[in-house]
């Protein structure tokens, strides 16, 4: 099993402390991996900085060819990636292979094409005897920090636009889920020029802080928690680095009386519980208009109760475990505090699963109120709440009354209502009569405490560039 770092084109063993990497389905240690030392962090950044002198001057066509080759390698090693992600994250193998891996390769292919379409603007003459033009140029070294819930996909979301724009990258996966990133490093080592892509491993305090604070790093891109985002913004403030933050979420799902009940139930069953609910866009905060509320709660309870929890290798498993024992206890705490409220009804689930691994039952809590902790805070587990509402004005206010602003959805047959509300929901993405759907061509990113900056799309590519004005006198 590949567990080495990638520094300046070479796979090397970390020189820091040994850290265990667990299989959350069993609680067993899969492998022990050595962190990068402080010297290795510096080596990776300096290698990226040196490589930028050449990589930043390559043509979009050259960069696109590298990204397309990497996409092909991901496709040809898809089963290996899926197996590693399943072991390390506890996800059902078939979900990773069929749902995630095609999207990972597609992101690299999209940005390969997008890089060839990125251009500045020839602006014209705004001062007599002078011609101005606008350039979009790469920034330099980008430090990318990926999360544990989608380690390979988030690595792709960060690497593809940064490399396509002409930057060099030092990527640090979560210390809990590095295995697919190590495999990606192995493939990239023989593909990219030395230093263009570097992969480190370690904890935030020992590796992440040194990486993000390095004076040669021009931009830091994070997908992670709000607390981690706050820390990195503060830690990098003295260096005035550009930051790109995709942080937490608590997606409101607005269900009106005229919604298609079956579509809503099927959508929440899928989109509220994918990856055991460990997703910033999970359909977890349901608001149901009072006319449809009783039927929705009943139908949802039956649908969610039918979800199959099981070993990741089992083709019939729909939910795997939570990522760590600590995170399981966090989810248990949220649910226990909610269950203690007299107005909250446990429709289904609500308990941990006995046995090995960090499993929690898919859970539906009805009658939760707007002010309840379970409604206001991100649980990041297989837990969905349903709250009844009266009318558009009330539910719009409740949906926007949140510190989060990443994703939302509304379910109605009324086109006018859909347009009215989608224009006023304070979220980076709003789906109508669906949820969770992402494509490489469209941007993904948040507002408020959910962060700023966009992943995917041409907007994502532009985020990794500097706008420059060049003026000619003639």
Swiss-Prot record:
Enumerate the PROSITE patterns for this protein: ALDEHYDE_DEHYDR_GLU (PS00687)
One GO BP: L-lysine catabolic process
**Cross-referenced InterPro entries:** Ald_DH/histidinol_DH, Ald_DH_C, Ald_DH_CS_GLU, Ald_DH_N, Aldehyde_DH_dom, Aminobutyraldehyde_DH, PatD
Binding residue positions for NAD(+)? 146-148, 172-175, 209, 225-228, 280
Q: Which UniProt keywords apply?
A: NAD, Oxidoreductase
Q: Does the keyword Oxidoreductase apply?
A: yes
Give the pathway. Answer: Amine and polyamine degradation; putrescine degradation; 4-aminobutanoate from 4-aminobutanal: step 1/1; Amino-acid degradation
GO terms for MF: aminobutyraldehyde dehydrogenase (NAD+) activity; NAD binding
The residues responsible for catalysis, as annotated, are 246, 280 (nucleophile)
Q: Which family does it belong to?
A: Belongs to the aldehyde dehydrogenase family. Gamma-aminobutyraldehyde dehydrogenase subfamily.
PANTHER family tied to this protein: ALDEHYDE DEHYDROGENASE-RELATED (PTHR11699)
Entry function: Catalyzes the oxidation 4-aminobutanal (gamma-aminobutyraldehyde) to 4-aminobutanoate (gamma-aminobutyrate or GABA). This is the second step in one of two pathways for putrescine degradation, where putrescine is converted into 4-aminobutanoate via 4-aminobutanal. Also functions as a 5-aminopentanal dehydrogenase in a a L-lysine degradation pathway to succinate that proceeds via cadaverine, glutarate and L-2-hydroxyglutarate.
| Matches recorded under HAMAP family | Aldedh_Prr
- Name of protein: Gamma-aminobutyraldehyde dehydrogenase
Query: What species is this protein from?
Result: Serratia proteamaculans (strain 568)
Originating gene: patD
